[in-house]
Amino acid sequence: MPRYCAAICCKNRRGRNNKERKLSFYPFPLHDKERLEKWLKNMKRDSWVPSKYQFLCSDHFTPDSLDIRWGIRYLKQTAIPTIFALPEDNQEKDPSKKKSQKKKLKSEKEVCLKAKSEESFASNEPKKHPVNTDLLPEHAELLESSALVKPPDPKAESVQNNILTLSLVKQGTRKPESILETSVNQDMGIGGFHTSFENLSSTTITLTTASSEGIQQPLETQEVIEITTNHLANPHFTNNSVEIKSAQENPFILSTVTQTVEELNTDKESVIAIFVPTENSKPAINSFIPAPKTVEMEEDIDIEDSYKDVDYETEVLQIEHSYCRQDVNKEHLWQKVSKLHSKITLLELQEQQTLGRLKSLEALIRQLKQENWLSEENVKIIENHFTTYEVTMI
């Protein structure tokens, strides 16, 4: 199992470091609370609780805190890591601060987009388009409805037609209660809008169209349609007069379909703003199409890296558990081996000589016993000679 360094700014991992530079990983002192607090304080992660599967690499320890025995580096029991990156680097790499920065950037982009849209409305001259709508059912409840928008398909004709279909579906049912169809023509003209409602309140809906696959497309030209309806005083039957204004804008990115129902008031006028892309919009070819090929390539690279990691881990194990230093030449080692062999042969010769002397002395003692030339004094002298000889031999 590969080991990673638990420090925030450290990317050391067993198997991916330089072969020239040895790395060793040490677990946290979970049983020694005082020492663990010092470790976490130096790491500037006081509230973090490490597990037994997390380690620190040897780069964070001074050479005094490591004990080298037989070519293996052991961590002393009083060692404390002191070498860490600056706090500014940690703040830059803090994920929570990254998220807050991303949120700020998104909000700034939204503000810029709104400002651009307002400038485009003010600068461009409006075009009038006719819109015909029919609301079929009676007593439709807008509070329980949700709007579904289908983006239009462009046609290669001299007259550009864009059709939007809005279906209001009641929650809990599958049948649409009302269908609103708007046809937008780019020919200049004045359009009238007449609808029949029964006991309906006015609404404000803002709709933006985007690709159904979720791919962001830059729209070089875009039509913005604004519909304003004015209610009459008749409580049972209302006629709404509608004006449609469209303006072409510079490249503008629409990423989501937003549908909001803001107000429900019979006394106030309602506004419906619809953003419609024209035929001149050129969808950008994004890099999501060749996704399976990139996935296969990444899988092959990961497999090759795993094999390399296994080979390198075996090499690291052999180096860590070897009983000689790697900077010694082979010739020097062979010289040491030959010297040891010569010493062994000398010891064997000395052993043979001592055995021969002992055998000769034993034969002499037997001969003296047979001839009865031995006395107590002579025996003591011989025993003393044997003891001194054995001591010198040892």
Swiss-Prot record:
Residues 86-109 are annotated as: Disordered. GO terms for cellular component: nucleus. It is found in: Nucleus. Cleaved by HTRA2 during apoptosis. Residues 347-381 form a coiled coil. Has sequence-specific DNA-binding activity and can function as transcriptional repressor (in vitro). May be a regulator of cell cycle: THAP5 overexpression in human cell lines causes cell cycle arrest at G2/M phase. Interacts with HTRA2; under apoptotic conditions. Interacts with ABRAXAS2. This is THAP domain-containing protein 5. It comes from Bos taurus (Bovine).
